């Protein structure tokens, strides 16, 4: 079966020449759900073995939405209730052991179905890391056509793409909002932003948590190009068609040299990041923040990081400090 023939729950596929366009459709908000990550895992694995695919364009399939941010419900098994605090140094070996188990063929499905919320969360994180690293090692070029908000986990998926184009529109925002939710990035941002922009900018962006406009993101170096909204997909696909004509072996070796050549510790860095993410998610403050998020989501009928972000930016929406 070709990659374009996959039947996925949250991604619509269309192939023209060697360019496969993947539209994420996860209503109502296009959050990065467990199903989205599972589908991206399946898609990237299939693209790697499909000789007819030289580039993948990832975009949002809902009007005005790219990948808004990670789905808080997907984290429920790990951070939805207070539990004894887990230091990152204790979480790290647990996550490594879990990854070893999940590496066994068929284990992800079993743990996802029978492991409860914690099991589903572990599979989600395992697939996330596996998928984004596969994208970075692949002979397929990945391009993000950012047609809506790309915050938190949505921004981390975009950062895993080789090129990022965004629509020149006011509703498009990019950035890492995790500290506003009493968390740290868990899908790669601490590692990728540091490699992309340097430690000084990475720490500023992740500590502040404030989303950027596309023009700000372009100046920072988060984006490669800003395109008039009506032309975004066509222009991204045109670039993808050029890159898809490159030798896949050349693309793969070039990407591996760029992403992994200067520093062999990206994988270890991702492990450390996930461990810290789990650790901060075990606090009572994280549970309060999650509760407040869902209250706002119901009240506003949209993510509060878009519909009413100021109290979260100011740190006044919920007490994130008290233990």
Features from the language model and the residues they span:
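Catalytic-core regions built around general acid/base machinery
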Residues: 39, 43-46, 127-139
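Short acidic-hydrophobic, aromatic-tinged amphipathic segments that line or gate anion-handling sites
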Residues: 165-167, 223-233
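Conserved CoA-thioester-binding segment of acyl-CoA-metabolizing enzymes
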Residues: 1-66, 76-77
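CoA-thioester-processing core
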Residues: 131, 135-139, 145, 151-205, ...
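Glycine- (often His-adjacent) and acidic-residue-rich active-site loop
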Residues: 60-130
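C-terminal alpha-helix plus adjacent terminal tail
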Residues: 1-17, 63-65, 209-214, 234, ...
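Glycine-rich phosphate-binding loop at the start of an alpha helix
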Residues: 125, 129, 152, 211
